[in-house]
Amino acid sequence: MSNSKEIPSFRWTQSLRRGLSEFTTPVKTDVLRDAKMILDGLDFNQVSLVQRILRKSKRNDGDLDKLRDLNKEVDNLMSMKSSQRDTILKLGDLNKSELMDLASDLEKLKRKVGQTERSASGGVYLGNLSQSQLTKRSDLLRKLGFQQQQVRSPGVVRIWDVADPNRLNNQFGSVPALTIACMTKQSDNTMGDVVQALTSLGLLYTVKFPNLIDLEKLTAEHDCLQIVTKDESGLNISGYNYSLSAAVKAGATLLDGGNMLETIRITPDNFSQIIKTTLSIKKKEGMFVDEKPGNRNPYENLLYKICLSGEGWPYIGSRSQIKGRSWENTTVDLSTKPQQGPRTPEKAGQNIRLSHLTELQESVVREAMGKIDPTLTTWIDIEGTSNDPVELALYQPDTGNYILCYRKPHDEKGFKNGSRHSHGMLLKDLESAQPGLLSYVIGLLPQNMVLTTQGSDDIRRLVDTHGRKDLKIVDIKLASEQARKFEEPIWSDFGHLCKKHNGVIVPKKKKDKDIPQSSEPHCALLDCLMFQSAIAGQPPQTKLEGLLPDALLFTLEAAFTI
């Protein structure tokens, strides 16, 4: 597509909002909580100092140190932040066409950003030569017939004369909580006044891009908006400046609806699905990366932000502690690896969310799955629904080997209902479940393997979702009372293996009150043991051995919420 084509920026923005609406979340409470923390905890003398630094025409390493130190203080005060999580997208996360499309756009974006940053310097030297060396260099170039490029730049050209330009990365994006706190403090208004004013800008943003004329009209109603600068926002100066774009972004976070892109939250579980959805919207709307230097269009802006970090709030969270750029932190691996069974991505619209394991983790899982003998009876059971499983168990009674893994649910409402009446698992215990592990295990099941289960419908749907239609499912179809005949001895002997079922079970009301109802939670592994015991007429006699190490089941950084 020609880069000269006019870009319908707001139409693209609206299309992205609609298409990515399922990933947006209400953030007003979180933003205001962080704003209050910043307002109460930040030294605003240092804020004023940094704002003066940002107004200087030339800034050095000492100035950058002050900016970075203040950014770190802000980051420490905030709960909404992006984490350093480098991501390698592979076949299975996206299809080959999508991976190639993403790789191409990231490369174009890299060139565009590089050219924009170079042109923004206005031809002014950004390195660390001394002034005398620069003068001598200019004289030498003039003698050799090179004419100095005449650069037209609106206003003052502000540059960073620093030894390591990489230290500038991720230090300048506006953060709504910081914008609200600074406006409250420095405009001498209440936070309530600031919130009302920014909300008006946010509401306007749902139908158009607010401009300076709109700002002037709104300022007549909201005095605190006088602090918003009328100057065009420049590159690498917006962190603590009251630009219109920073105010609009803050306003977007204060709305209860609107599917604002600013409220997207990325997790390791939904990252690949967000990328997939974005590429689909791009194709439908004819979006593209325009490599000409200049401001990013809505698609470019979204792509840059979501690829910078695989976890957090890409638009509005603190990201000053992230190292690297988008094309460095999100990379594409087009190589294919032989697998024990076919592993294909989920179908559009389904809730299975594939994520990524490290090379070492994949190696450990492959080694464990290599001990599953496809010629032996293999029980399989899950907790949760087929399109949103939270626990998977495989059990081979002949050897005692078992696989047990977990997954954070996508449908929290459905999960809580299942927790209350069935499995008793708690959301807080699954927050740090290793992303992608459950799906990877299913993908590694040997080709054409036979799996034994009590009730086959959900298992059939689960393996089909993962592209494993080759797997054979045998349903033993025991009566409910017969299937749970050994429930008490199984829980007595093996309950210590069931560590994530700590909720209280409330039995559902049934028409037949003569049938006793169990108050024990359903555990995928223990259910497999019960079903096998019902067939064998006795509890397992072979010592059980878990094939996956506990350290692999959950990530090291446990989830923490306030």
UniProtKB/Swiss-Prot annotation:
Localization terms from the record: Virion; Host cytoplasm
Assigned EC number: 3.1.13.-
Primary localization: virion
Positions bearing the site annotation: Important for exonuclease activity: 458
Keywords: Capsid protein, Helical capsid protein, Host cytoplasm, Host-virus interaction, Hydrolase, Inhibition of host IKBKE by virus, Inhibition of host innate immune response by virus, Inhibition of host RLR pathway by virus, Interferon antiviral system evasion, Manganese, Metal-binding, Ribonucleoprotein, RNA-binding, Viral immunoevasion, Viral nucleoprotein, Virion, Zinc
Organism domain of life: Viruses
Molecular function via GO: hydrolase activity; metal ion binding; RNA binding
Enzyme class: hydrolase
An example Gene Ontology CC term for this record: host cell cytoplasm
GO biological process: negative stranded viral RNA replication; RNA-templated viral transcription; symbiont-mediated suppression of host cytoplasmic pattern recognition receptor signaling pathway via inhibition of IKBKE activity
Residues the record lists as binding Zn(2+): 391, 498, 501, 523
Function, in words: Encapsidates the genome, protecting it from nucleases. The encapsidated genomic RNA is termed the nucleocapsid (NC). Serves as template for viral transcription and replication. The increased presence of protein N in host cell does not seem to trigger the switch from transcription to replication as observed in other negative strain RNA viruses.
Membership in a protein family: Belongs to the arenaviridae nucleocapsid protein family.
Complex and partners: Homomultimerizes to form the nucleocapsid. Binds to viral genomic RNA. Interacts with glycoprotein G2. Interacts with protein Z; this interaction probably directs the encapsidated genome to budding sites. Interacts with protein L; this interaction does not interfere with Z-L interaction. Interacts with host IKBKE (via Protein kinase domain); the interaction inhibits IKBKE kinase activity.
Name this polypeptide is given: Nucleoprotein
Species for this entry: Sabia mammarenavirus (isolate Human/Brasil/SPH114202/1990)
